[in-house]
Amino acid sequence: MSFLKTSDPAVYNAIMQETTRLKETIDLIASENYTSKAVLEAQGSVFTNKYAEGYPGKRYYAGCEYADAIEELAIDRAKTLFHAEHANVQPHSGAQANMAAYFAMVKPGDTIMGLTLSHGGHLTHGSKANFTGKLYHVIEYGLNAETERIDYDNLEKLALEHRPRLIVTGASAYPRILDFERFRAICDKVDAKLMVDIAHIAGLVAAGLHPSPVPYADVVTSTSHKTLRGPRGGFILCKEQYAKAIDQAVFPVIQGGPLMQVVAAKAVAFQEAMQPGFVTYQKKILENTQVMAEELRKLGLRLVSGGTDNHLVLVDLSPIGVNGYDAQLALRRAGIVINRNTVPFAENQTANVPAGIRLGCPAATSRGFGPAEIRQTVSWIGKILKNIGNEDIEKQVLAEVIHLCRKFPVPGIDA
């Protein structure tokens, strides 16, 4: 970055500070990960200079022959990786992938169903604060209060009562396997379409370690980062009968030109996910997450649903008298990066000051952490949570965290 260092020291310094932060902290945010050096190089390539409105072979600008080649490569790889009939790799984000899917499948004012945000859903699944809550008539479904898993019986009851045009599944904080076959059966009973958002679990699905929604869903949306380890962006998979509607919804309805440098990086990430080592990596994520869950239980902490089937755990801190906001700040001061999160059915919580925290293992696993490092990290978490606001303990843990982190290079930066 010699040119940037000279031309814009302020931006250069911020990048260097962020690099140091990545090296000296343990990232347990379930939606974050480290990309490979190859993905970073593709995203920083000359494709950032190219406008490519339209689709391969049907561009509105000249000079798109290599943009076409890159996008076709990304499309083919996405289809192969997920065994899909059609793929659109242009969405700038998961939220925009979802928006395009809605615009293609339903009309404003139609009834849709989505998992309520406080039970692990996502803003784009029907939140009143989101465009979905403003454009559509949203019926929320939730979890069973005893099992803290999706209440499929009540979901079916609500579907039969309200007859939605679209049912959305997928989550941002749900630690259990989703029953796509049951969702499909419910949709068929009310003649609804099924949309599945696999943003969090795409890597697990690609590796065959979580059931795939592709055989059951009309449309599947995802991000290309998180467990998939690609660049920040989105993509859509669908059955061939919806291909034209999906493509038109992405362009020209919600986007103009695609970010071709990101499309190039997506192509690289899809190729990386096809390698045998990617399955091994995803298995390690699951192993580390099981170790994390067990160690958290040993500390006496309550896990939502009692455990996890995927890459994340949701911890209810209300029994120990700590809120998620204070926990997030204290752990950050100690070099452990997590996010606060609402807990299903918890009382006296808000989005800003929720009752719990969400922890995940994708980034730590990418860095090379195994069960031993996860156990050590959870022990530090326990020490911080039991001594909220104790600066001496926070400094002690921070020093130990930095010492551990120096043994594990950061993908894309150190290796």
UniProtKB/Swiss-Prot annotation:
> Where can this protein be found?
Cytoplasm
Listed GO MF terms: glycine hydroxymethyltransferase activity; pyridoxal phosphate binding
Q: Name one GO cellular component term.
A: cytosol
Give the enzyme's main class according to its UniProt record, as a single word: transferase
| InterPro entries in alphabetical order | PyrdxlP-dep_Trfase, PyrdxlP-dep_Trfase_major, PyrdxlP-dep_Trfase_small, Ser_HO-MeTrfase, Ser_HO-MeTrfase-like, Ser_HO-MeTrfase_PLP_BS, SHMT-like_dom
Does this entry carry the keyword Disulfide bond?
Answer: no
Q: Which GO terms describe its biological process?
A: glycine biosynthetic process from serine; tetrahydrofolate interconversion
Alphabetized UniProt keyword annotations = Amino-acid biosynthesis, Cytoplasm, One-carbon metabolism, Pyridoxal phosphate, Transferase
- Feature type site, description Plays an important role in substrate specificity: 225
> Which Gene3D superfamilies does the entry link to?
Aspartate Aminotransferase, domain 1 (3.90.1150.10), Type I PLP-dependent aspartate aminotransferase-like (Major domain) (3.40.640.10)
Keyword Cytoplasm among UniProt keywords: yes
Q: Where along this sequence does the record place binding of (6S)-5,6,7,8-tetrahydrofolate?
A: 117, 121-123
Q: Which CDD domains match?
A: SHMT
State its Enzyme Commission number(s). 2.1.2.1
Q: Which cofactor does it need?
A: pyridoxal 5'-phosphate
* Cross-referenced SUPFAM superfamilies: PLP-dependent transferases
Provide the assembly information.
Homodimer.
What's the protein here called? Serine hydroxymethyltransferase
